[in-house]
């Protein structure tokens, strides 16, 4: 979302609930009574389940499998997993981890990523979305992503909770929009551990107002081998930050990095359109 989206400095991730095993909830099966109990014990978990029930009501009715998992890999914060109707477990999948920006949440009904995900459900039943939530300021500005610890572990636990076991030939994507760049910066530590064949940077190369921010952290990770497992990096920029940041990323990432021209969308700012129209980039 627009605004001063990366004024929170990159810090050492907070380790949350390191010894608690993952828990998963099938959104369609959680009763009102269970939800009421969760609101007392795990408010953020309950809110994610409740929002997902409403936001994806039509998709659930059509046969989508939607789960919410808590895992130490995401610092104990909820992870929403979306398996489209018609998903075939015998065919290769594309598993996309997406870190959202400010003023939204993983299951926000009006989230710029939400609209694109709904479109992708109709286009590609083999694309599974894994949406880790932040630990603080969710839905506001200055989203607190200090909970991000292990993106690969988050994906493993989320897929297990959804009953998805990707077969040979499956691909992995990581995307970040806006303030989600801070989450990506944390996910790229240590460099080379990102579980991704493709990395999608959606207007997320911002700095902090009081020092280096996501852009510097991501660039340093790329220089240190952070694209070890990545073959394709797509940058979608809107001109809201200096263009030399894109150039620096292209220089560090070499031929793996390409720019995708922003496609505007009526009624949305270019910043929002970067996620609404480019969550799934065009093929290389």
Identify what each model region corresponds to.
Residues 13-95:
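A domain-start/cap signature at the N-terminus of enzymes
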Residues 234-284:
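C-terminal catalytic histidine-bearing segment of alpha/beta-hydrolase fold enzymes
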Residues 133, 175, 202-203, 236:
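Alpha/beta-hydrolase-fold catalytic nucleophile elbow
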Residues 176-187:
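Glycine-rich nucleophile elbow surrounding the catalytic serine of serine-hydrolase chemistry
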Residues 88-161:
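Active-site machinery of serine-nucleophile hydrolases
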Residues 188-197:
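Conserved hydrolase catalytic core segment
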Residues 166-178:
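Alpha/beta-hydrolase fold nucleophile elbow
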Residues 199-209, 237-240:
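Active-site nucleophile loop of the alpha/beta-hydrolase fold
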